[in-house]
Amino acid sequence: MEGDDLFDEFGNLIGVDPFDSDEEESVLDEQEQYQTNTFEGSGNNNEIESRQLTSLGSKKELGISLEHPYGKEVEVLMETKNTQSPQTPLVEPVTERTKLQEHTIFTQLKKNIPKTRYNRDYMLSMANIPERIINVGVIGPLHSGKTSLMDLLVIDSHKRIPDMSKNVELGWKPLRYLDNLKQEIDRGLSIKLNGSTLLCTDLESKSRMINFLDAPGHVNFMDETAVALAASDLVLIVIDVVEGVTFVVEQLIKQSIKNNVAMCFVINKLDRLILDLKLPPMDAYLKLNHIIANINSFTKGNVFSPIDNNIIFASTKLGFTFTIKEFVSYYYAHSIPSSKIDDFTTRLWGSVYYHKGNFRTKPFENVEKYPTFVEFILIPLYKIFSYALSMEKDKLKNLLRSNFRVNLSQEALQYDPQPFLKHVLQLIFRQQTGLVDAITRCYQPFELFDNKTAHLSIPGKSTPEGTLWAHVLKTVDYGGAEWSLVRIYSGLLKRGDTVRILDTSQSESRQKRQLHDISKTETSNEDEDEDDETPSCEVEEIGLLGGRYVYPVHEAHKGQIVLIKGISSAYIKSATLYSVKSKEDMKQLKFFKPLDYITEAVFKIVLQPLLPRELPKLLDALNKISKYYPGVIIKVEESGEHVILGNGELYMDCLLYDLRASYAKIEIKISDPLTVFSESCSNESFASIPVSNSISRLGEENLPGLSISVAAEPMDSKMIQDLSRNTLGKGQNCLDIDGIMDNPRKLSKILRTEYGWDSLASRNVWSFYNGNVLINDTLPDEISPELLSKYKEQIIQGFYWAVKEGPLAEEPIYGVQYKLLSISVPSDVNIDVMKSQIIPLMKKACYVGLLTAIPILLEPIYEVDITVHAPLLPIVEELMKKRRGSRIYKTIKVAGTPLLEVRGQVPVIESAGFETDLRLSTNGLGMCQLYFWHKIWRKVPGDVLDKDAFIPKLKPAPINSLSRDFVMKTRRRKGISTGGFMSNDGPTLEKYISAELYAQLRENGLVP
């Protein structure tokens, strides 16, 4: 074409630089200026000249010139040196956390808090009456419906929920209002403890202020459940009706009894009996009866029955709960005289039959009759399900109108079957008044209060009435802000008050010092000094739990569970909050013990930042993680590595997500999953070897000095099992491990009768610590008891040091019985100087005792609970065989279902990926949970002291070399062995005794 010569091969105009945009703009500006001057005439030039003159005049007025370009009022300084430190940033970073909307769904502003159907001021006025306050924990296995149960209560209490969509209203999607973390919503399970304070009404229209705490159901988060148990007066244990009483439910019942907490049971998911299992009414009754019988087999004499109003039936998916008492009041109250309602209610459970106005405990002859529960409750319920799902609306209308006095709207008749069924059931059962009524009947405020405080606090004192005394349970990240969850046991707490905070890790030592029999003057001075050392904090804010909001209040009363801001920096895990008016009150104050988190953290990872310069961010984030996850343990090894100990894979996965995405916001390198080990022995010490602090290794004579001799032997397995449960003995002879040394006579009797100890050893027990025991086996002829008592505290402290970190790999010692055989103390040495030397020498003597008793390495064993369809059992067995040391010890058929409950054991170090393998192999039809409740430890195969054990490179170690392999790898990771990757400088007795003595032992064949 003719115009092709004007453009090059790339479409650019020839002769013009395509990148010279300035030239193009200048050409356009000149053209526009020319056109403007041409068409507007010369008048425009006069305007420009006048503007220029005006601007020059204004500059002169302001004093702007070449000498003063910014005016005479502006001083220009020329600096040649830095006035700011190079370490000071030009822009200060934000030190406070932002609201972190990206990881939480939360209502921040008070004006946006959803309104309730009741008057909140009336609820707050009820806080002045402790008897009208109930603290309820909602606990149960995974996916049993705890959070959905809380949704029903939240919906009943609020006028409008901000996050409630149409699908949620119709029942297609769960609300899960108490899951306010996006991680919880994405994973589909609760991770953190949450709660809500509500005003609830029972069947008698009496109102109560109830603080509900919703605990996670996954066993990895059992530490959160432990916090809920510590805070609650009563627990609702929610059970999936299909799975029944699993091993998790058994453990929750035992923990509730141990914590002196009253119990109610919610048998949830009744819809699954009808729609999933398709059981006929009689079979459904037998299934429910079987579950309740299993519950009563674990409750130690406390009888639970639907007619006692402590068993609630529910289907949280369909939005209803009911008790037998409530069902009768809705369905039969209009046809039965009020005087006979209670009598009729008591006959609606068990082997009771009805025919023509008569009740019998045996079936009627020649009459096909069902038990009363089936006839009067299940059959009407089945009819409602049948009519609603089959859309037989005329029959359903008649049934509802004649029996429940309920009318259906035209809009409801247009619903799909499932939303329609939910709507009908909610019309019948209305609000959750039956559930609230059961809670109020089970709650016994005065009996429970004393038992609970006695269990949670250190024995020996009684806090004065009226003194502010509260239990700080944990630190929570609530809506991006840091709050403390606190239960108040006595006194009044107001915003702006100054309070004292004592960490529970210091409670025992503090209380012991106050109980010492010393003079009044010394006691008052000591108490005053100690009180000055206790951190004091100002209460900045007080709030009530709301699920996805915090409702601010000005004060909190006895019995309440509240959130407090401003005190979290004064403690780590939990604490005692108090404020005393006098020194006498201070002497009587009780302190709370550290919480028992049920399980022990044995799942281990090592991590470090990807970029070393980001280490401060990691350290700050780890401090937050340590506070927000109650059961986590964070340590720093000598090698500089940061170690995190948690409860399992899911626990670690959630923790690391928070660490990366919410708190540190950096990239992190982590190790493969590891575990902790324990050190023990398998035999008695072969010799009594004294350990001295004045050993000569150069041939000169030994100087007289301090020497200690300790022997070790394995503890009885029965005693180890009892100590793992923090008790000794059984029944009335049972002693709690925390106060075990306070009653030496009873302890001696238990050791003789229950464990077969001789009288001398049982009377001379000095200490129990971390599953180990120290016994004084010295002879009065060799050392006087008076002299020994002077150094008893230091000897026990040295024993504590030894069992915390053993000689093999600095892992805790477990299951060892130490005996103090002899101690030699020079008479011409100052006592205070001698005390400082006894502690490390006693630690060394315990190491020698262990190394002379055939030391072994113990590994933790997970118990695994698998729910799987029966035909898939061979797959489970095959998966267990592939894991070293795994075994199945029990298989239980779940009654009325095609499911099996498989119980087994698998070593923690072999458990990584087991759940994933199970889910993939069974196509999602198998579910497992791994836990370390019973604290089972098993010997690792091999000899830890065998230097010649074969350990190949880049290959799994042989079974007989595992013990040595684990010890050496642990020592290298901790920096104990510094000889490189293939170093073999393992534990040895030679390190702790003289070279001459070691050579003699070697000649006699006592050491390798």
From Swiss-Prot:
Residues 188-192 are annotated as: G2. InterPro entries: EFG_III/V, EFG_V-like, EFTUD2_N, P-loop_NTPase, Ribosomal_Su5_D2-typ_SF, Ribsml_uS5_D2-typ_fold_subgr, Snu114_GTP-bd, T_Tr_GTP-bd_dom. PROSITE patterns: G_TR_2 (PS51722). The keyword Cell wall biogenesis/degradation does not apply. Residues 315-317 are annotated as: G5. Residues 214-217 are annotated as: G3. Component of the U5 snRNP complex required for pre-mRNA splicing. Binds GTP. Belongs to the TRAFAC class translation factor GTPase superfamily. Classic translation factor GTPase family. EF-G/EF-2 subfamily. This is Pre-mRNA-splicing factor SNU114. It comes from Saccharomyces cerevisiae (strain ATCC 204508 / S288c) (Baker's yeast).
